[in-house]
Amino acid sequence: MSRAEEAAKRAELAAAQERAESLKAQKLIDAFLAAAKAKGIAPQPLRATLYSGKSVKTDKVGWYLRKNQSVAVGDDGSYYVLIVPGGFRERLSGVKLQPNPPPLVVGKGGKDGETGDLAEFLQLRLEPGWAAS
């Protein structure tokens, strides 16, 4: 097997693993949606942060999962990363969020220190007194 074939095989295996992880994570999100609805925790309009640090409105509503409001779950069950590119136009008109494949570990590879299992973030969000700073 050539190096190119080996690299392609590794990439294929990694993609398959990511898909399997996302399926497991989506099941957790679906359970969260049902629990949030049962507890009467209403979704709120989501805001995103541009790379420049400016906060902008989005076209989605949902629940923030991190205190810094960098990730959220939409009321449609989608997972959103809320740090987005944009400029003056986005500051005026807002941004249209695109869903991301949900990970089982939130913030993996990040440097801000707020990483952990998706299940833990979802559970914390259901607890009374949770509020994004």
Task: List PLM regions with ranges.
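N-terminal domain-onset segments
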Residues: M1-T58
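Generic structural signal for short, flexible, solvent-exposed coil/loop and linker residues
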Residues: S2, D30-F32, S52-K54, K60, ...
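Generic structural hydrophobic/aromatic packing signal, biased to beta-strands
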Residues: F32, A36, Y79, L104-V106, ...
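Generic structural motif recognizing short loop/turn segments at the entrances and edges of beta-strands
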Residues: K39-Q44, Q69, G77, N100-L104
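Amphipathic, interaction-prone secondary-structure segments
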Residues: R47-V84
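Short linear, low-complexity motifs centered on an aromatic residue
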Residues: L82-G94
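Helix-rich interaction surfaces within compact, conserved domain-sized segments
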Residues: L92-S133
